[in-house]
């Protein structure tokens, strides 16, 4: 039986090596997400609303997105029109078309950002009919979406990397450090 501290040291080293071996994925997949990120940034900077949702397994990530894009201490950042669509009363339950019509009347130029599986038909109708959208999906339901592997052992890590890329790109463009 191994000593606990030796086990931790070995685990950390193994994880570090594994992540290092997989770290090139962002470079390899750049063509699939760069246009989507640029389009989303342009949408937000032109006054559009970004309605964010996630499947039940990635609710933690939804909270992470919302708390990082609009932190409670807004001294350093402007307030962005980023809304928790999962918590919205407009989240489709029965009539997706009615929900979409209400959303479009309520939010200025809404765009949907969904992460994960699409867990109900009403949401699927809305997400797949609204163009443009910023979809990070596990199954290819739409041409312009970022396709991820649900059972990827590094999925959470990749989601965080993608978000950090998006967040840094958004604020770099917003503060005129980068042009679209």
From Swiss-Prot:
Record-linked Gene3D superfamilies: DNA replication regulator HobA
Top-level taxonomic group: Bacteria
Keywords (A to Z) from UniProt: Calcium, Metal-binding
Binding residue positions for Ca(2+) 3: 140, 143
Induction description: Expressed in logarithmic, stationary and cooccoid stages (at protein level).
Protein's UniProt keywords contain Cytoplasm: no
Pfam families tied to this protein: HobA
Range of residues in the leader sequence: none
Co-factor requirement: Ca(2+)
Residues involved in Ca(2+) 4 binding: 176
Traits of the deletion mutant: Essential, it cannot be deleted (shown in clinical strain N6). Depletion studies suggest it is required for the initiation of H.pylori chromosome replication (strain N6).
Coiled coil residues, start to end: none
Cysteine pairings via disulfide bonds: none
Cofactor descriptive note: Binds 4 Ca(2+) ions, it is not known if they are physiologically relevant.
Chain sites annotated for binding Ca(2+) 2: 140, 143
Binding site for Ca(2+) 1: 17, 27
Alphabetized InterPro entries for the sequence: HobA, HobA_sf
One Gene Ontology molecular-function label: metal ion binding
Function field: Required for DNA replication initiation. Increases binding of DnaA to oriC region.
Quaternary structure annotation from Swiss-Prot or TrEMBL: Forms dimers and homotetramers. Interacts with domains I and II (residues 1-112) of DnaA. In a crystal with domains I and II of DnaA HobA forms tetramers with DnaA fragments bound at the dimer interface of the tetramer.
Miscellaneous field: Estimated to be present at about 3000 molecules per cell A structural homolog of E.coli DiaA.
Name the UniProt record assigns to this protein: DNA replication regulator protein HobA
Source organism: Helicobacter pylori (strain ATCC 700392 / 26695) (Campylobacter pylori)
